[in-house]
Amino acid sequence: MTASKTKTEAVAYRWQRYYHTLQTGHYLTVKTKQRLEKSAVFQTQGSLDGACCLHVFAAVLTILGLAKHDALADMSRRKYGVPAEVFQAFRSTYFDGIHAHDFVDLVNNELMLPLSLSLRQAADGGLDKWTMDNLMRGELMACTFASVKNRRTKHWVLCTGCEGSASGRVIKPDTILVLDPSGGEAQYAAFNARMVVPQTGPGSRGGKTVDELQKSKSSKPIDWMYESPIAVNEPVRLTAAVRFRLTEWS
């Protein structure tokens, strides 16, 4: 008599992954090849300025080892180096902010940095999936979003990673982890806010995941639920995303 085989249930769990050089702790830090010591990442946006993009870009420069965190925090008083050049390029946007395509043009045309920027906007189609696919590959991203309800909320955040569920070999990402410059310091985490595909209630669309909702470029954009400890949860849509990659100094 042969023994019958019983099917074992697949192990189910939640997972998170974030950019590989980020180190969590009392506050979020990064360890780069260019610096001996770990460096803080977060830059705080003020209550009067519209420079969320500049604060996000400063965090990107720190993470990629292109400038020191403290020097970037003092960029308006710097006379030389990358922080001074960044402030000169972005000073006119400090109160009004900047759109994603203008940001990419400004970095490419005004700053001689070893960066390769890839931009996708909502009009290009497939923005949600493109963003999540890059985060799943471990890329460093920034995105812009707007409120679904009134469009008055328009904001930049740094995408530090993603989150989702897994059952056996099936992995389903459903959350973008972000570092919001208007929020507080990320403590013992690589994010201080997140954008979640609702599983129930308004905007849930049957509890489907990003891959299921974004099968083609013509798919309807996802209404993400933006969750932050300092604000009421709000449905938002991605309007653009930028991928950052290091190149060689010319």
Q: PLM features: what roles do these ranges have?
A:
Residues 6-8, 54-55, 237:
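Generic signature of intrinsically disordered, low-complexity, basic-rich segments
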Residues 1-40, 250:
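Non-catalytic, low-structured ubiquitin/UBL-interacting segments
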Residues 12-13, 18-26, 30, 45-50, ...:
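Residue-level signal for functionally critical sites in structured catalytic/ligand-binding pockets
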Residues 14, 19, 84-203:
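Conserved active-site-adjacent core of cysteine acyl-enzyme catalytic domains
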Residues 37-121:
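Cysteine-nucleophile protease catalytic domains, especially the papain-like/related folds used
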Residues 162-250:
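Noncatalytic regulatory segments and standalone regulatory/sensor domains
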